[in-house]
């Protein structure tokens, strides 16, 4: 694999440390991929010319500063020089946020979100904010503000949502790590539909500002190891989130991980909504057998969701979206 935009974090960091590659060169490779893919997939939030130029200068400076740190042998952290993206609803100081909605008034944050602060502290180079559907309340990449975000595998297909741009950017290799948010599937749907590693952490594990009941931030990556190193950074504490779990130093590495003895629930029938497609059910059953072969204890979960519960959940989300809009 000769295109460094496709490399994982460990490979990039090794190359930076040896001096065989620089963060500046990797940023250039990522920008080349953005220029090639973006007219089709529409994964990044578009800004006016002045803002775009300013953000390009910011990322170029971050890459140059990282290059100098690596030259001195003093990287800031595990993501120094690594190109990343963040979902539009994760604040970047001075970058307008509109929640994917053309009818919303843009909000310009004065401070980076906890996620963005942790990434910068670790030396990451932020190459852009990724698109989302209106208020993040749609399982596709269709937005009244951004238009349609499309799958790099096949532009005729949806990315899933609401971390639509994050998923598309990950497949197109706009960097190694792409941070999305998730309440009811917004990281996991793009991850599943696009063939990525998608991790929804426990509520409160990754600090947010402001915290939002049920919402978490987590990584979309092309490798499990990259998701693990992303979590080692994103899960660091921030006192702005009063719902955060107590800080702890977890070992996020996966090299020696085993599923032996792990309890795995296999949910094949939701009990409400659309029935599961037979082909999808077959894949889920195959995954269950794979876990069993690795020593996990797999148990089928019986349906618990009712049509009334689903209707109530839908009403709840509609009301929350109305509050966001107002």
Annotate each predicted stretch with a short phrase.
Residues 1-61, 293-295:
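An N-terminal boundary/leader segment
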Residues 23-28, 113, 251-252, 276-303, ...:
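Acyltransferase
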Residues 43, 239-245, 292-304:
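Flexible, glycine/charged-enriched surface loops at secondary-structure junctions
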Residues 53-64, 123-124, 133:
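Long amphipathic alpha-helix in the N-terminal Rossmann-like dinucleotide-binding domain
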Residues 66-82, 257-265:
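Immediate post-signal peptide segment of exported/extracytoplasmic ligand-binding proteins
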Residues 78-115:
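Enzymes and membrane/adaptor proteins characterized by extended Gly/Ser/Thr/Asp/Glu-rich
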Residues 111-234:
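Short glycine/serine-rich loop segments
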Residues 200-288, 305:
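A short helix-breaking turn/cap at a secondary-structure junction
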């Amino acid at each position: 694999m000769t295109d460094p935009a496709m490399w994982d974090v460990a490979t990039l960091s090794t190359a930076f440390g040896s001096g065989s590659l620089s963060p500046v060169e990797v940023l250039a490779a990522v920008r080349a991929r953005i220029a090639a893919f973006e007219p089709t997939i529409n994964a990044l939030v578009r800004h006016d010319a002045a803002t775009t130029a300013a953000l390009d200068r910011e990322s170029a400076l971050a890459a140059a500063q990282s290059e100098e740190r690596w030259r001195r042998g003093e990287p800031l952290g595990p993501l120094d020089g690594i190109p990343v993206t963040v979902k539009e609803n994760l604040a970047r100081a001075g970058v307008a946020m509109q929640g994917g909605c053309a009818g919303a008034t843009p909000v310009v944050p004065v401070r980076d979100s906890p996620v963005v602060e942790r990434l910068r502290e670790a030396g990451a180079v932020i190459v852009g904010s990724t698109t989302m559907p209106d208020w993040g309340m749609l399982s596709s990449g269709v937005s009244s503000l951004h238009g349609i975000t499309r799958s790099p595998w096949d532009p005729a297909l949806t990315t899933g949502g609401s971390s639509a741009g994050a998923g598309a950017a990950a497949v197109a290799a706009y960097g190694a790590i792409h941070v999305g948010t998730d309440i009811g599937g917004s990281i996991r749907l793009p991850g599943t539909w696009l063939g990525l590693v998608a991790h929804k952490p426990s509520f409160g594990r990754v600090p947010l500002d402001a915290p939002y009941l049920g919402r978490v931030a987590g990584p979309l990556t092309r490798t499990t190891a990259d998701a693990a190193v992303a979590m080692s950074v994103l899960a660091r504490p921030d006192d702005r989130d009063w719902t955060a779990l107590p800080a702890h130093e977890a070992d996020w590495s996966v090299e020696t991980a085993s599923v032996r003895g792990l309890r795995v629930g296999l949910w094949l029938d939701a009990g409400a909504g659309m029935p599961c497609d037979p082909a999808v059910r077959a894949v889920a059953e195959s995954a269950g057998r794979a876990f069993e072969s690795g020593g996990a204890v797999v148990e089928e979960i019986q349906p618990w969701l009712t049509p009334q519960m689903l209707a109530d959940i839908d009403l709840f989300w509609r009301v929350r979206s109305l509050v966001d809009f107002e």
